[in-house]
């Protein structure tokens, strides 16, 4: 996943990996099964992505790390735009526990419906966040996040896992 530049800012990068071409090259040499980009990177590096023949996943939403209130990650790219860019799947983050979770769940519902009607898999990044969340990587919260992914129709669910015991239970 290469959406961290949007989400975390430049702190996750060094002189090499700040360049999307470097990431595409690593993915190609490593025979990765997919690369995940935000819309802007996918647009600007579309020729390189297509030449690499690595399946593209477009992350449809995002937020910066500058706002410290309850997390809300809004849709920034449509399923239709992702398809035009050659996406083989789309992804969307939901912060369960945030006071804004219903907004994100509703956006996901619409994305999932449109993506599936176009035979496109949907990945849900589901992270427990918000002022009421304690122990955001506990086994119970991990299992809850996985269950929500199942219930909302995600084809793949990405969660933060603290240890394998928690993952096995989830």
Where are these regions (language model features)?
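Alpha/beta enzyme core
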Residues: 3-170
